[in-house]
Structures are given as structure tokens and as C-alpha cells.
Amino acid sequence: MAKRGDELEKLLGPLEAEVVRAAWAAGEPVTVRQLLERLNSGRSQQLAYTTVMTVMNRLADKGVLRRHKQGRGYLYEPVASDSAGLAVRGVVRDFGDAAIAHLVDEAKSDPKVLKRLQRLLEEE
């Protein structure tokens, strides 16, 4: 059986995946310092502030985290609530309309999936 989080590490590196999981666990926008404290709690080898800041900035540049200016620093929050959401965002970002068209074509081949997709669209 696959270890929980393996899907995320397929999309990102191990440290990036750990940062994203910590941001999900926070449940609200966080500063670099707040996430650093969360990551370092119970950890024998402490991460440096600059390491976490660099990783969070790279994740924001990749579109995985959203960055909001607050005072002299930033607040960060995940753009998706799970690894599937991140994967879909990446596919849509990389392939655009073609990815959406293929998704709809796949949904058309299974009436249950098509109904679910329609229901989800109506909820938005």
C-alpha cells in the first residue's frame, strides 16, 4: 500500500511536500515564521528560516501557494485543498483548454461521471 503523501511527492520534492502538508494542516494563511515553527516542532534537525522562506517562495512561483502582502512580509496559503487539486491545477496550467476538453470527453463516456460533473458545476 502506498504511503500517504506519496502522490504529493510525485508532484513536488520531499521538502516542498512537507511544507504544503504543513500549510494544509494550519488551515489558515500563515507567515514563514509560523510555518517554520510548525515544521520544526518535534524535529531533531531544525530547518532554517531562509530554507523555509525559499521553499515557500518557490511554491508560490509554481502556483502551489498563494502569497498575500501583509505589512513587511507575506501570508501564504495553499491554492488547493489536496494533492488531486494541485495535480488538476498543474494539468490545466500546462495544457489549458485541451486538458479541459479531454476531461469533458472522458465525463461524456460515463453518464454517472457526467452527472456528477454537472452537479459540481451547478454548485459553483
Q: Where do the model's predicted regions map?
A:
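Short alpha-helical segments that sit at the start of domains
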Residues: 1-22, 26-29, 93
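Short acidic, hydrophobic short linear motifs in intrinsically disordered regions
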Residues: 29-39
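Short helix-coil junctions and helix-kink-helix linkers
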Residues: 37-47
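Short, hydrophobic-biased segments on the C-terminal half of alpha helices
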Residues: 53-57
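Glycine-centered, phosphate/nucleic-acid-interacting loop/turn motifs that mediate DNA/RNA or nucleotide
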Residues: 63
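Short beta-strand "wing" residues that participate in macromolecule-binding interfaces
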Residues: 67
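Short, cationic-aromatic polyanion-contact patches
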Residues: 70-89
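Amphipathic alpha-helical dimerization/coiled-coil segments
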Residues: 86-124
